[in-house]
């Protein structure tokens, strides 16, 4: 026999149910959830497992917000397996013939020209490593499984005229990266971190803005306009005409050319 619940009792039960608080997320849980949504927006497994990336376009350098240099640029990035101290290597080729290069790895930083190969020094290497470890795309691609990596949700905001979700990302070495994620597309809009600069014995704020996301292959979306600021002054912009992922790089691309002359610092 089916029992009918009187209307008043039913309404009372429904009202009581609304008084039971829903289980709320912690700021860390919500922060990591947004990070996972960002990975999905960037291409999901296509993003997580991409092995190489090529960005081709124009690189601009600035001083006091004024353009001081413009060059065609090809930037090659490869990702290394787990266990490497830094799971990313990069070669930046500049010039009309792309014969000027900067090679950056976990252990060395070189400038290669027709004169030879010049070591860029320890500070340039440290800057590359710190910039990489703070980079939101590198964090999402290579660092998500680190046990002490935490995402703290800081609330909603408006950045670049876009609604965003603000996250603070912390690692076990007390690095902090703040990133602003678009509330609708879940693509990174802006990031900021601070690093110590021994040249001025003070901290510098490094800000990067990302726009013009386009398909790069295998379902991956990548920004075609990347702008960097240091202490509120624009210092660099890469405007890519084309970005591709999954290219097969020739062997030795991230090594010094055989027989190259090694110059003094």
Protein language model features and the residues they cover:
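N-terminal secretory signal peptides and thylakoid transit peptides that target proteins
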Residues: 1-17
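Flexible, processing/modification-adjacent segments and terminal tails
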Residues: 26-33, 106-175, 185, 195-202, ...
């Amino acid at each position: 026999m089916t029992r009918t619940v009187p209307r008043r009792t039913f309404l009372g039960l429904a009202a009581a149910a609304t008084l039971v608080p829903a289980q709320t997320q912690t700021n860390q849980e919500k922060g990591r959830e947004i990070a996972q949504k960002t990975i999905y927006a960037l291409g999901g497994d296509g993003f997580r497992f991409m092995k190489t990336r090529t960005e081709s376009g124009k690189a601009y350098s600035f001083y006091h917000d004024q353009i001081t240099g413009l060059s065609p640029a090809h930037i090659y990035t490869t990702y290394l397996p787990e266990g490497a101290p830094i799971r990313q290597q990069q070669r930046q080729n500049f010039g009309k013939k792309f014969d000027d290069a900067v090679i950056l790895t976990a252990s060395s930083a070189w400038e290669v020209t027709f004169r030879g190969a010049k070591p860029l020094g320890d500070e340039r290497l440290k800057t590359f490593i710190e910039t990489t470890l703070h980079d939101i795309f590198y964090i999402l691609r290579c660092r998500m499984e680190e046990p002490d990596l935490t995402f703290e949700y800081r609330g909603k905001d408006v950045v670049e005229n876009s609604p965003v979700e603000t996250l603070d990302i912390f690692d076990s070495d007390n690095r902090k990266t703040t990133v602003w994620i678009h509330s609708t597309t879940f693509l990174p809009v802006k990031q900021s971190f601070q690093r110590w600069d021994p040249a001025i014995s003070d901290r510098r704020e490094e800000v990067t803005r990302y726009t013009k996301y386009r398909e790069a292959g295998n379902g991956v979306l990548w920004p075609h306009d990347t702008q960097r600021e240091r202490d509120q002054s624009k210092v660099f912009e890469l405007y890519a005409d084309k970005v591709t992922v999954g290219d097969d790089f020739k062997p030795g691309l991230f090594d010094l050319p055989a027989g190259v002359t090694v110059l003094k610092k």
